[in-house]
Structure formats: structure tokens, C-alpha cells
Amino acid sequence: MTLLDLGWNDAFEAEFATYRELGWEPARLLRDNKISYGALVGDGEEYEAILSGKVYHEAETDADLPAVGDWVALDITEDDVVIRARLQRQSCFSRKTPGKSAEEQVIAANVDVVVVVTDAGTDFSLHRMERYFTLIHRSGARPVVMVNKSDLFTAAENKLAAEQIQALNPEAEVMITSVIKGTGLKALRSLLKRGVTLTLIGSSGVGKSALVNRLLGDEYQWTGEVNEVTGKGRHTTTARELMILPKGGILIDNPGIKEVQMWTDETTLRDSFRDLEELSMQCKFADCKHGSDTGCAVRGAVERQELSPARYESFLKLEDEIEGLRKLCRKRQMTLERRAKRDHKIKARNRSDREAHEFQLRPRKDREIH
């Protein structure tokens, strides 16, 4: 095994030059264990590494901290293994942290391909798929969708699901598969080349763990059963993990995702909804909100049944969500600035008090102020 097998490239090598002079080694993070990280170096040796205080305190947000898939600089000694720096990410798939906080959650760093696993049954949701496509577009990775468990549905149902997903994003590669039967996986395997990083996302119970087992060639994970009543599966992946596949390629597996919350901007959203963006160029007003505005070409297309009402409503909903996110981020930034200003005042006051105290402790002859 070499660094190239782990996804190393010339850009990482150039950035790492200064760290190499310090005697540190490049490593890719396999796992985040909360208090430590699993890290793999070029010769295949795995280390349990801790984060240096400098890296921790220089991170402005949790998203700036190392995550699974990141490249880091390891300081390896007899006593411990310390992460001294994180290299710049070349791509990053992330979402807004669930809840009301304005925080980014990194799902996988430095990924080339994001594979969304779904099925033609209870998990099928075009609205959720639109969210996935928007986040994948922002990440810079290649979008791939697996309509899995084809053995449980008719050919017509699988074909319809695949066609509807393809219509949302003509650039995405959509494949109909059955991991259990081993059908439809040839196209996916062709993506798994040396140094290429692929991450799996999707709901619980859609077959991600079974796919990992098949790609690794053994029963790597326990695979949960799906409730026949609800159609939902139990989580079989409890933490994100990066794995080097036997036949080449790198796989980052993720626990089932329940909430696909936006972490992006309006520009990325419009790029993901190119059909609406092209229509908006025909609107009467440049700042048309595509609501009740006069001369809205987008709403006109909906009325003429040239644009799906569901897609139109989905766009408006995501636009509102992104606007809400922007307000949350602005509010959070103001809070951080106030906190920083307060901390600065406290430090200044403490320094002044300390200097005054030291002045009082000096011998009287040294207290004269010149």
C-alpha cells in the first residue's frame, strides 16, 4: 500500500512539504472516535491519534476540525501520535447540523463520488433527492444514485423511480441494483479505481451495509432486518468509517441519514435547479421571487403544466430554508463577535488589574512614574 492508494495527489504533496521538513507523516483519517482518531499512513500502518491543542483551538467551528476522509500531519513518537495539522479539503460533503443550530456537519471529506442509495418503495422521495443533489453539487463530487432492492419491486416500478430521479439531474448516473442478488453493480464497481474515494449516503435499511459487505468480500458488518410493517430498517452502521477496498478504491460508509438539511447558498441551489433558472431568465423583473410577482415565467410554466408543481414548491421551500439558514448564520456571527469583544475587554481589565497590583508590590522608590 502507498499514499496513492489512499487518495494522495500532487496538490496534497505540495501542501505537505513544510510538514515533511518537521518530520511529520501524512495520514488519512479512518474514524472519528470523539476523543481520538483512527489514522492510516502510506505503508498501511494504522495509528490511534489525538488532536493537538493548537489544531483544536484554531478551529472556529466544529466543521473546521478533522473529519473522516481528511488528510492530516501526524507527529509520531514513542509516547503518542498527535495530529499537528489538517490539510485543505479538495471536496467536502456536508449538511446543516440537525436542530436549530447554525452549524455545518461534515459527512465526508475529500470525496470524488457521492452515492445515494434508495429504493422504489417506502424510501423513495423526490423531494429528499433534490436536497441530496443540491448538497452534492456544493461538495464538488460526482452524483450517483442506486435504486436498490430491485428484486423486491417490479421492473416497471424500478424503471419509473430511476427515470424520475434522472429527470431531476441529467448529469447524475442512476443505476438499478439488487445488492442481495448481485445485479446492476458493474457500473458501480467501475467507479472504484485506485485512489478514488466514494461515500455512501441514504436512509437506514436501503442496503448500504449489504453493499459494503459485498464490496469487501466478507461479512464486514452485521446487517439489520427491515420491519415489514413500516418498511424501515435498523441502523447497521453506527459511525462513519473509511475503508480501503481489496480491488482498489476507497469507501466511506455512513449511518442512515434521517434529516437532509441544507448547508449551501442560493447560487448552488439555482445551479441544482437549472430548469427553473433558465425559466427565470424570462421573468419580467430581474429580482422576481417566483411567487406572486407579475410576469413570472416560472409560475407561468407551472400553470401551463410545463413544470411540475411539486418541483416548483420544492424550490421555493428550499429557497426559504436557505434564507433562514443565512439569518441563523448572521445571528450566530454577531453572537461570536459580541463574545469576542467581551472576552477582549475582560482580558484587558484583568491585565490592567494585574499591572496595578504589580505596581503596588514594587518598592516605593521604584513606583515613581517618569
Model-derived regions, located:
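Structural detector for short beta-strands of small beta-barrel domains
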Residues: 23-35
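Canonical P-loop GTPase G-domain recognition
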Residues: 142, 151-206
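Helix-rich effector regions associated with P-loop NTPase G domains
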Residues: 2-3, 20, 42, 60-71, ...
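A conserved segment at the C-terminal end of the G1
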Residues: 208-224
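Conserved Switch II/interswitch segment of TRAFAC-class P-loop GTPases
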Residues: 77-94, 110-130, 144, 151-156, ...
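Beta-strand/loop nucleic-acid-binding surfaces
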Residues: 46-65
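SH3/SH3-like beta-barrel fold
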Residues: 37-42, 49, 74, 83
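Short boundary/loop segments of OB/S1/cold-shock single-stranded nucleic-acid-binding domains
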Residues: 1-25
